[in-house]
Each structure stands twice: as structure tokens, then as C-alpha cells.
Amino acid sequence: MRKYLPFLLSLLLAACTEKVDLQSVSDYNDYLVVDAVLTDNPDHEQTVNLSRTVSYFFDEEPPRVQGARVSVNDLVFEESEPGVYLAPRGYHCEPGTKYHLQIELPEGRNYEADASMPERGFRLDGIDYAFAGNKSMGLDSLWTLAIWGKDDAIASYYHITLGVNGDYYPFEYTQFMDDKYFNDKEVKGFPITTLVQSEVLRKRYGDAFKYLETGDVITLRARSLEKGYFDFLLAQTLNTTSIPIFSPQPANTPTNIRGEHVLGWFAVCPEFYASVTVEDPFRPYYKKLFPWF
């Protein structure tokens, strides 16, 4: 996500301005972008990413913010590469703990934010796949993914990512959703998302978009989100579709980072996974629903 967040937020800055001076697009580089998402998974690298917004009008990499002091609850994150601040190996967050992020830039500006982990919200027992056809909507092939489990009675919000053999979809192909269709219910074979194979996408993003073969492992990774972070992510995906000329102006993008000229979010999320091994990539039904087939 850190590659796309500065660009997406730059689009929102442009879209939220009634009059845009094309000669002063460098002004958008004045905003710090904070991408800080920590999880309860000790095997997941816990990072805080700092960059600057980039102009909507130029194809350029977001400038990385180097030399900052970044800490969470007084634990210092070390800069592992330009703009990427990494927690010690094995560090992870825990339910019921409040987390305080502090950022001090080399020029002396300070930023801070607070977050706590929401309840998991869903017990994920398993997933399954079904072939849905090929040459559909310009895609080479399409599969649907269904989930099994139990949703809690509380309102919950999720960020869902798919992976094939450990290669995961990029941020713009992930999914955000609430639980309005299965709140407080046992879930058996609910079609949650789709997996696509496209040679064009495979060449651009890697083997997450490969054609499924026997023995491939499909993994669904889900994160439970607090409502503010869900709204923030939704703003990145929905408001940027309104950029073309004559479209309505979106609302200002939300942030929970305190400080001047700053965008982004600090979130703490429980993370859970389920996987299925492909037996027959052309199987047109969920075997977990029809095990006798």
C-alpha cells in the first residue's frame, strides 16, 4: 500500500481544491504521508512508512522521508530503508492495549496519533474456490472465493487480500467491506471475492494473477478494521474515481494523525488467514458444500 497511498492522497488534494493552478503543483509535496498499520501477527513485519505527496500531474515516485525518529509506546522503529521504519523482529500488537505513535522529522516537526485494536469480529474456518469461466469482462479467467466461519454480533469492517503461492494482490486490487450481509451469523459458503487471471496483470504485478494450476495454494488474508480506518481506506478507493473533469468534488480525506500538513492513518489490526490447495482449477462448485462430488 505504501507505494500508492501518497499518489492516492495527492489525487484527493487536487480534487478537493476548487481552483487548481497547474503551475504550482509542487505545493502538493508539502504534505507528509503516514502509512502506519500494525498487526497482531508476530511473523508480519511491523512498519511505519513516511513519504511526501506527489503531484497528480507528473509520474514520479513519492519522495521518502529519511532521518525521522519514529516510536510506538516508546519503542523506537529503526529506518531499514529510505522512509521505511521497522520494529524489532517478532514485535506485534495485542488486544486491549492502547498504542501511541510519535514521529519527529529532521527539521523538528512533530506528529502523533493513537490507536487500539478492534475485536477480530469473525472466526475464519476455511475458504474454497469455484471456477467461474474465462474471457469474462476482459479477464483471461475468473474464480470465486467463498468463506466459512462465524461473524460476531458487533458491526465489523474488513480489508481482504488474496494471494497465490505467497504472492499477494497489490493494494488497488484488495477489497474493503462490512459485515451487513452476515452479521452475527454462521457463514457457510458465502462468496466473498473473486480471483482473476490476466496475463497483462501478471506481467505487471506478478504471479498473484497467474493461471491456477493443480497444487497452487490460494490464501485469503483478512484484517479487522476500526470504523475510522475503514472510512479512510474507502475514501482512497471511492473518491479518486471522481477525479475526471466535471465530476463532483469529494469530501476531505480523513486522518487521525495530529500535526501540520499531514495525511494518512495509524491503525492497529488483528489479522487472520485461511488457505485452500487447488485440486482441479476448472471445478465449477465449492467442494466444501458438495464433498460427495
Language-model features and meaning:
Residues 1-14:
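Sec-dependent bacterial lipoprotein signal peptides
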Residues 17-293:
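A sequence/structural signal for flexible, mid-protein segments enriched
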